[in-house]
């Protein structure tokens, strides 16, 4: 059975060119880039080339890029560095819909005496800039938000957030793990101070990422030891991963033109599902959204049941973040949006890539209506019960 992979916000297929670029650094050019001999030196040059490729994709300088192991490390490093640089400030602002790699760090910091403001979002997943303005104080060290939500694809007004953070004297960090390679970036003209990315979300292997640190932003390293990454991230370099990320960044720049094609396929999927299946709606902002992502709610059934049914046909989708998919709780993102109980528990995410085909989308459109019809036929919730649940959603959630 062939696989139709529509879970690209969880991870992506490694591009064949990326694999070809990294393999020689596992078998042939395996020297340590910190070594003084020529064998290690040529590896060091390749690492610098990869750094330049990542910088070019971001519209940044090579010196502003450090390699990390993943998005989680980058987020931890950015948040803790911002606080270490401003020990007199004890306030952080983030949002209620962040990835666990941000929210759980903030919860840990609250236990250490920091005050954290979690900005709310509206029913379309957008923040209120007036709420941000009201939250900013002279004690605010950091504003940390995602660029685009991993579950709904909703894109935040990043530059407007950044300008407000700057006016308040706060450092602005952006978790752009879902956005890099999907939206054009030019950090030279941006208000972003630090930005996190992860290789496995843009067709590089798992275990490699990068952190952008604007020139002049004070940074205390999370990992201390050797002199690697100009003293900003200790540890022997993951050279094959760095080469892979560099090549993936180069290809991502080229494939930014595919965004229109991805959006057309995404829209075809959405429109087909909405027209064929009643009591169905798209979760998130109608326009300010990643071109590859759709989060759709099907009333009166459980999202997990839909995913299991799709899995029988080799179709891979998700009910939310892969980092929390083992939890039986409903999505914290959709809860924050205030969605009704019936949509909250019946929502799934499809996330496309440059490899997604029209035939794959049509296959999903063929299979979804009978799957939903069958699940609704055996669902314990009638329309009347569902209406009752909507009025009781808060009680049931607890």
Curated annotation (Swiss-Prot):
SUPFAM superfamilies: PLP-dependent transferases. It comes from Trichormus variabilis (strain ATCC 29413 / PCC 7937) (Anabaena variabilis). The active site is at residue 323. Catalyzes the removal of elemental sulfur atoms from cysteine to produce alanine. Seems to participate in the biosynthesis of the nitrogenase metalloclusters by providing the inorganic sulfur required for the Fe-S core formation. Its cofactor is pyridoxal 5'-phosphate. [2Fe-2S] cluster binds at residue 323. Pyridoxal 5'-phosphate binds at residues 71-72, 150, 178, 198-200, 236. The lineage of its organism: Bacteria, Bacillati, Cyanobacteriota, Cyanophyceae, Nostocales. It catalyses: (sulfur carrier)-H + L-cysteine = (sulfur carrier)-SH + L-alanine. Belongs to NIF2 gene cluster which is expressed in vegetative cells and heterocysts under anaerobic conditions only. This second system appears to serve as an auxiliary system that does not suppress expression of the first system. GO terms for molecular function: cysteine desulfurase activity; iron-sulfur cluster binding; metal ion binding; pyridoxal phosphate binding. This is Cysteine desulfurase 2.
